[in-house]
C-alpha cells in the first residue's frame, strides 16, 4: 500500500510517495489493509476525506489477496466519498522497468535504485518488446506484453495465464522481466526472450501503480475495479467463507474510516 501526492491530474504529472506499507504474509490481507491505510494517513498527516482518488490493483493475482485489496479500496472510497479506480497489477512491473531504464534512477521510489542497472546491458529502445511476468503457481505465469514508445509503453497483449513454454516469441529486441521471468528463464530464452534481472525477486509494488497512474493521468484512469482472476481458484471457496472474508475487509476499512473521523 502506498500513499502519494500527485501534482496534477494530467498525463505525466510528477508525484511523491508519502507513505508505503507492505507485508510478505500472504495469509493476512484482510487483517492488515485497514491498519495499513490508517498508518499511511497518519504518516502523511492527512484524512481519508482529503484524498482525491483511491487506486487498486485488479490482478491478475492470488484470489484472497486480490479480493481483500479491491474490497478494502471500495469500502474506503464509499466511507470517504472518494472515487475508486482500477489498474491491472502487472502494470506496476512494466512501469518499474521502463521508468528505471529511462531515468537511470527510480525517481520518486528511490528505494529501488537497482532498477536502472537491470537494463544496463539491455538497450530498452523505442519499439522494443517487454514481457512482464509474475508467478501464477500451478507451473504457470501471469503475463502481459508491452511495446516501448515515446510516451513510455503501450499494452500489446494480456493479461494472460499459461505455462511459460507456451508464450510466443517476441520481436527484436525483446526482454522478459519480473519474478515469473526468473522462475522460467530457460523456457523463455528458448523462445528468444532476453531475461532481465532474473536473480532478483521483482514483484508488483503499489508505488509503481502510482507511478503508472501519474504517467497516464488521473483523469484518464478506469473506474472498473473488477477483479481479473483469469482462471478458477485452486480450491472452491465456500460462499460463507467468501462472505466472511469480504465482511472482514469491509469492517477493517470502516473501522479505519471511523477512527480518522474521531
Predicted regions and their residues:
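DPxDG-like acidic metal-binding loop motif
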Residues: 55-89
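N-terminal beta-alpha supersecondary unit
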Residues: 1-58, 260
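Surface "functional belts" at beta-alpha junctions
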Residues: 12-16, 28, 83-203, 234
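Residues at secondary-structure transition points
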Residues: 24-32, 63, 67, 71, ...
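Phosphate-handling active-site elements
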Residues: 44-49, 77-87, 111, 220
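Acyltransferase
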Residues: 197-262
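Conserved hydrophobic/aromatic positions in well-ordered beta-strands
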Residues: 2-4, 142-146, 228
Amino acid at each position: 500500500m502506498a500513499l502519494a501526492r500527485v501534482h496534477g491530474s494530467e498525463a505525466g504529472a510528477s508525484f511523491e510517495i508519502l507513505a508505503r506499507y507492505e507485508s510478505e504474509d500472504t495469509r493476512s490481507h484482510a487483517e492488515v489493509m485497514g491498519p495499513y491505510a490508517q498508518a499511511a494517513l497518519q504518516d502523511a498527516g492527512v484524512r481519508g476525506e482529503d484524498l482525491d482518488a483511491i487506486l487498486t490493483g485488479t490482478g491478475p493475482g492470488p484470489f484472497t489477496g486480490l479480493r481483500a485489496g479491491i474490497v478494502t479500496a471500495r469500502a474506503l472510497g464509499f466511507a470517504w466519498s472518494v472515487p475508486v479506480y482500477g489498474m491491472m497489477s502487472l502494470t506496476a512491473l512494466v512501469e518499474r522497468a521502463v521508468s528505471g531504464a529511462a531515468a537511470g534512477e527510480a525517481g520518486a521510489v528511490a528505494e529501488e535504485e537497482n532498477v536502472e542497472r537491470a537494463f544496463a546491458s539491455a538497450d530498452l529502445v523505442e519499439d522494443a518488446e517487454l514481457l512482464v511476468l509474475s508467478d501464477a503457481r500451478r507451473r504457470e505465469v501471469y503475463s502481459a506484453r508491452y511495446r516501448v514508445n515515446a510516451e513510455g509503453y503501450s499494452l500489446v497483449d494480456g493479461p494472460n495465464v499459461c505455462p511459460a513454454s507456451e508464450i510466443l516469441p517476441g520481436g527484436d529486441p525483446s526482454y522478459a522481466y519480473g519474478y515469473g521471468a526468473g522462475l522460467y528463464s530457460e523456457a523463455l530464452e528458448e523462445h528468444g526472450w532476453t531475461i532481465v534481472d532474473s536473480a532478483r525477486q521483482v514483484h508488483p509494488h503499489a508505488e509503481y501503480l502510482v507511478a503508472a497512474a501519474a504517467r497516464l493521468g488521473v483523469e484518464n484512469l478506469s473506474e472498473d475495479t473488477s477483479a481479473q482472476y483469469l482462471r478458477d481458484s485452486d480450491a472452491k471457496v465456500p460462499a460463507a467463507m467468501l462472505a466472511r472474508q469480504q465482511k472482514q475487509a469491509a469492517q477493517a476499512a470502516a473501522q479505519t474510516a471511523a477512527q480518522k473521523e474521531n
